[in-house]
Amino acid sequence: MFILIIKCGIMEKEVISSREFIDRFVECLEKGEDFKLKDCVVEGNVDILNIYEMIKDKELKGGYIEKKDDEIVVNINIKVDIYNVEFNGDFRFFVNMEYQIVISVFNGNAYFRVITFKGSVYFIRTIFNGDVDFIDTIFEENAYFSVTAFKGNIINFSGTIFNKESHFKSTTFEGNTYFSVTTFNIAEFYNSTFKSHVYFDDISFNLLSFTDCRFRDDVSFKKIDKENFKGLAIFLKTQFLNKHTTIENFQLSKTSFLKTDVREVLLCDVKKEEILSHKILRIKEDSGNKDKDLENKLKELLGLSYKYIIDQFNYKSVLAEYRNLRISIENNRTYIEASNLYKMEMELIKEFSNGRFEKFIIGAYGAISDYGESMEKTGKWILGSMILFTILASILRFKGMEWDIFKIIEFWWISFWEVIRLFLQIGTEDKSLWILEPIIRVTSLILLGNLYIAVRRKLSRK
């Protein structure tokens, strides 16, 4: 089979017009020959409407065009291989006319490798029936892949740079999908479905948003920190349907898993920090201790989606996120991190509690035992209270005595022993301690109860 190759220059790129690009593209379509373009600069807009206009009056023996009620489908029945090309205008393979839309269907493999798109790129409602490769490609303006179907075995965006917004709304990825070593500015995945393996390894971003998305097979996320990148990630109502899901180096202070079940997700490199959803909830509630810098960042990055996203946050949903995260971390046997999350979960409950008494009780629980997470802290409270009660008991029992060292030691020892008896709920026959007895008993119940919770929690995690 003869393959038409457009090769523009060897040492430096030659400039061609978008009209020449379209002429050669249509020529390949008519002849059924693969289209190759290499080492060129294309000036002007590339528009599927111009391709449609050139072939609509020709015989449709190749099945290039299908007309439906409200759309015109341009079938690209050839392989497309474009390498090291710079497009200086918009690249539109979707056009919305007054009464009809023009969409594209790539029936062969589509390779756009080492490309620079200087204008906006539109692959809206496009169908890729073969493999797709955008490796090492730069999108300098917005890129739209909404309502797009990637049906091939391989979808590769590795090494790609999205300098502005990238939209993947209601997009379907059927084959193995690679976004490895990819740089996003603002990436929005909304109502998208990933049916096979997905790799978001070594990525960097300002905002990465997954809303109402579904991952049916295993998926791995690994973020790398870059200077001047905010690294905010939002997983809202996202479904991870495979147990082999790994999320690495996504700091909880910059990541929200609101209404997302992560109980069986492996979260790596979790540090002690307040989760992003807790901070956003403060912004929504307009509390006095909200993070104003974060609020401004979210407004800037989310744009028109800001109100919709922010309205999803409420006390119960954020509390559920804390608990899901804690269960996930406990399942991965990283108990120290799980303990830290539980403390912050209790801080959330205290912060949004309505009653002063409830806030006091929760605060006391935290002060005594770190919400049942610290045996050491509770032990210090027990020791300190017993010393204090021994002093008070000695004062109540004092009726005068000889200043003999052994008598003094004996006196203090008896006081200490009486306090221990009361602390262990055994009781005392010393009537002089009747005032102190109920105080010691109540304190004992509180402190020993906290110690029991801390010990049980520690043993359950062994």
Curated annotation (Swiss-Prot):
Keyword Phosphoprotein among UniProt keywords: no
An annotated GO cellular component: plasma membrane
Q: Which residues form a coiled coil?
A: none
This protein's membrane topology, according to the annotation, is: Multi-pass membrane protein
InterPro entries, per database record: 5peptide_repeat
Q: Which UniProt keywords apply?
A: Cell membrane, Membrane, Transmembrane, Transmembrane helix
In its UniProt entry, what is this protein called? Uncharacterized protein MJ1147
Q: Source species, please?
A: Methanocaldococcus jannaschii (strain ATCC 43067 / DSM 2661 / JAL-1 / JCM 10045 / NBRC 100440) (Methanococcus jannaschii)
